[in-house]
């Protein structure tokens, strides 16, 4: 529970949602334009792809959707970083590239780590500890959320000082999130179970026999 919630938050989702107006300002959008575009576009894409995930989860399966979405998140974060790193070279195209990359990031998150985090912790625990396990998962989610949001601009500031360049500082922060997404893929291979079409009783029986998550 804590593991999937760690990766759900540490790929930077809430920094993108909370600070999207500031991120768009850094990319060259101005004032109200940045705030409106960020809020509307991010919100609409998030809602639409979260709805889509409801149809995909039982068609594609949890593990496969996790790997598809997290891979997309990783590449999107790399592209967001590149938009900032090469903003001088891209010029006006920076805005288009950044918006496209951010919306891809939101879309991939909304079909994978977003809903899967909550779904998996509701399925994998034995009945006698399900309430406790879900509570720990929820606590971990908000704890990691607070930590990531609190450190976001500190990371940017630290990288700014390291490189002496604001664009590279912002880019490096998103690349850190991309590295965490890569680690999530490795972690997911071993610890994300496939519960599609498996009853809660069979899941509990699997754990009782000492089965591994990836073998479910």
Task: Label each PLM-derived region with a short phrase.
Residues 1-216:
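Alpha-helical transmembrane bundle of multi-pass membrane proteins
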């Amino acid at each position: 529970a804590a593991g999937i919630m760690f990766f759900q938050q540490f790929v930077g989702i809430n920094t993108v949602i909370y600070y999207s107006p500031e991120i768009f300002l850094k990319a060259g959008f101005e004032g109200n334009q940045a705030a409106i575009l960020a809020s509307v576009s991010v919100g609409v894409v998030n809602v639409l792809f979260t709805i889509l995930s409801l149809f995909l989860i039982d068609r594609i399966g949890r593990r496969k959707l996790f790997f598809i979405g997290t891979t997309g998140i990783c590449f999107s974060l790399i592209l967001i970083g590149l938009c900032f790193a090469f903003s001088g070279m891209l010029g006006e195209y920076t805005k288009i590239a950044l918006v496209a990359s951010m919306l891809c990031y939101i879309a991939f998150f909304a079909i994978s780590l977003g809903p899967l985090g909550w779904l998996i912790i509701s399925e994998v625990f034995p009945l006698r500890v399900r309430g406790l396990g879900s509570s720990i998962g929820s606590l971990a989610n908000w704890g990691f959320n607070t930590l990531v949001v609190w450190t976001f601009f500190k990371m940017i500031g630290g990288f700014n000082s390291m490189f002496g360049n604001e664009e590279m500082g912002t880019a490096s922060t998103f690349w850190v999130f991309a590295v965490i997404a890569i680690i999530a893929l490795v972690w997911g291979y071993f610890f994300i179970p496939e519960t599609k079409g498996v009853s809660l009783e069979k899941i509990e029986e699997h754990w009782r026999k000492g089965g591994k998550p990836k073998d479910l």
